């Protein structure tokens, strides 16, 4: 099989001939080795982990993976090679010649001259077995090891590529990247679900608080981006956010990543929605182009049919309905909801999923929410009798709410009244100052990055698209 006798003769002829002085082997990633156009015996060094070992009478076959690609590199060695520690999961360094493969399953293979086991792995104790496909739920028990499986490797490569694609979208669109703080004295969402930051021993700090004011882990970088939007017309941030929500649902984490943007000199939600839709489609297209094998594995193994669902989302223009229209659609539905839809009440997950299905499983923007439902910074539409603000949520298949955004209230007196009614005037005097000194119409949005990955990959549980999930009663590692 695979021309084993020919390979054996080649290996032995190499070992029996006088050993010439070789130049040092070039270190190559598995991805680069597999993509080599000229596999003409170049001496290379590949490092990685063994995914499979197969011993024949005269030839030993290994598959080595270093995380750079889904596909592994086939290594061919003389069967006399000491293979006692070559097991699934062991780490190796292989030096040899990169040659064209005789197999139709791969273009190139590595003809080994030297195999060094860097770290052994006892397959009896290793929680994952060769050729087994453990469930994502099972893998969550091993946050320190699950990245070594094919499916988690693919998810994390997609995550990496999506991160790069999002940065590229904003850079190409002229946005300035801002590092917003992790520790803050602001509660942007006003929900009170914050993690407070304190030193381990308050007695070591003479003041009442370490920072002289209560400090928290950020729930959003929006307010800091609004500061920056007074000097830069387009800004964005991409970083961790924290919510002390007592939830173990498939859609919530205590620590997750948010993509947030603020744009100055815009006066309509349409302008904002255009950027949101562009970001969604641009990043998805980049991921499909840069790691198609990884996306295909997730779709095939975890979400059959997701490929077609994603293509459907990308080729259609996103729809737009008002909050009022959404409530009317829900009230006319034959489905029995746990939460009765009524004007003035928030939309729940069951409502969001129904609306997406009603719209043909195309992402849909819901605009103009009741003023009473939204935070103080959203722009008053001055409408009646149903008083609304210029807010927008993007609902997507399988997830529900993915984006949330609004035009910001740039008018000083409107904002002053909203803050006064909420008892926040003193705490947000600095925010009012932004409206006193060169205020402009502006708006922004936030996108939950993990939910975005769930949407494009079709993964049901948010805990499976982040390397180290943190949620109620769980902070492993």
Language model: regions and residue ranges:
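Class II aminoacyl-tRNA synthetase catalytic cores and aaRS-like
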Residues: 1-477
């Amino acid at each position: 099989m695979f021309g084993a006798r020919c390979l054996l003769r080649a290996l032995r002829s190499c070992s029996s001939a006088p050993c010439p002085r070789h130049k040092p082997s070039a270190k190559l990633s598995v991805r680069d080795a597999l993509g080599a156009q000229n596999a003409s015996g170049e001496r290379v060094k590949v490092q990685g982990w063994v995914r499979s070992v197969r011993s024949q009478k005269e030839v030993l076959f290994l598959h080595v993976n270093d995380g750079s690609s889904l596909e592994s590199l086939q290594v061919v060695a003389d069967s006399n090679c000491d293979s006692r520690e070559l097991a699934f999961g062991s780490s190796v360094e292989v030096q040899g010649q990169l040659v064209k493969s005789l197999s139709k399953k791969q273009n190139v293979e590595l003809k080994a001259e030297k195999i060094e086991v860097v770290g052994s792995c006892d397959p009896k104790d290793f929680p994952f077995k060769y050729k087994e496909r453990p469930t994502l739920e099972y893998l969550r028990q091993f946050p320190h090891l699950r990245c070594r499986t094919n499916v988690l490797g693919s998810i994390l490569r997609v995550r990496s590529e999506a991160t790069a694609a999002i940065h590229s979208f904003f850079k190409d669109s002229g946005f300035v990247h801002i590092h917003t703080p992790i520790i803050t004295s602001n509660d942007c969402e006003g929900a009170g679900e914050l993690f407070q930051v304190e030193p381990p021993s308050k007695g070591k700090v003479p003041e009442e608080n370490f920072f002289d004011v209560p400090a928290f882990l950020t729930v959003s970088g929006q307010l800091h981006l609004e500061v920056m939007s007074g000097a830069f017309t387009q800004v964005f941030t991409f970083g961790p956010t924290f919510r002390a929500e007592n939830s173990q649902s498939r859609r919530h984490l205590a620590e997750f990543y948010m993509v947030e943007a603020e744009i100055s000199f815009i006066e309509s939600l349409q302008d904002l929605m255009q950027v949101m839709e562009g970001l969604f489609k641009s990043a998805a297209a980049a991921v499909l182009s840069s790691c198609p094998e990884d996306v295909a594995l997730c779709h095939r193994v975890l979400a059959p049919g997701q490929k077609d669902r994603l293509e459907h989302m990308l080729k259609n223009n996103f729809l737009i309905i008002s909050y009022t229209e959404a409530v009317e659609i829900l009230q006319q539905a034959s489905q029995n909801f746990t939460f009765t839809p009524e004007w003035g009440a928030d939309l729940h997950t069951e409502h969001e999923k129904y609306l997406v299905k009603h719209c043909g499983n195309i992402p849909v923007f819901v605009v103009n929410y009741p003023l009473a439902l939204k935070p103080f910074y959203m722009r008053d539409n001055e409408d009646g009798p149903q008083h609304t603000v210029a807010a927008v949520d993007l609902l997507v298949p399988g997830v529900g709410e993915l984006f949330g955004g609004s035009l910001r209230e740039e008018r000083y007196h409107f904002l002053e009244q909203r803050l006064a009614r909420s008892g926040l005037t003193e705490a947000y005097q600095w925010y009012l100052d932004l409206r006193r000194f060169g205020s402009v119409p502006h708006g922004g949005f936030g996108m939950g990055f993990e939910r975005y990955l769930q949407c494009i990959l079709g993964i049901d549980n948010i805990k499976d698209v982040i390397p180290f999930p943190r949620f109620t009663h769980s902070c492993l590692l």
